[in-house]
Regions:
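Short, conserved "active-site rim" segments that organize catalytic pockets and cofactor/ligand binding
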Residues: 1-57
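Basic/polar, cationic surfaces and motifs that engage anionic cell-wall
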Residues: 1-12, 45-49, 65-68, 75-133
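Residues embedded in well-ordered beta-strands
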Residues: 40, 71-73
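Short, surface-exposed beta-strand/loop micro-motifs that present aromatic residues
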Residues: 60-64
Length: 133
């Protein structure tokens, strides 16, 4: 079992109101020469949680933090103009994210929760993780 110290929240950087799947993200990541989808979990707009990369395998979602973190991605994070960062989470996604983080913190009690933007000069996940989770 990997020693998990961080749970890192991401957005897919896709426009609000549009549905994408784990397979879509996997295809994008494979095209970028990743070994697999970079995230461990993906939360769809309807609030359903889907597994990506297995938890026992390091992700590919946050440079310098992959070895000891779990990556969660929600579908959305960009306005309809496809450029402007925006918190596009549906109420179902917000609830699912809170529940998933709670479950992971039970399994990894010493893990801290962060937004990708805390480690990289990015807007991702397009909301302030520290004030919401």
């Amino acid at each position: 079992m990997r020693h998990i110290t961080e749970i890192i929240i991401h957005c897919s950087a896709t426009p609000e109101g549009k549905d994408f799947t784990v397979e879509d993200i996997r295809r994008w990541h494979l095209a970028r020469k990743f070994a697999d989808i970079g995230y461990h979990y993906v939360i769809y707009r309807d609030g359903s949680v889907h597994k990506g990369r297995a938890e026992n395998i390091a992700g590919a979602h946050c440079l310098g933090h992959n070895a000891h973190s779990i990556g969660i991605c929600y579908i959305g994070g960009v306005a309809k103009d496809e450029k402007t960062p925006k918190d596009t989470r549906t109420p179902q996604q917000k609830q699912a994210l809170r529940q998933l983080v709670q479950q992971l913190q039970f399994v990894y009690p010493h893990a801290t929760v962060h937004g990708h933007n805390e480690f990289s000069c990015k807007a991702c996940p397009s909301f302030n993780v520290q004030t919401e989770l």
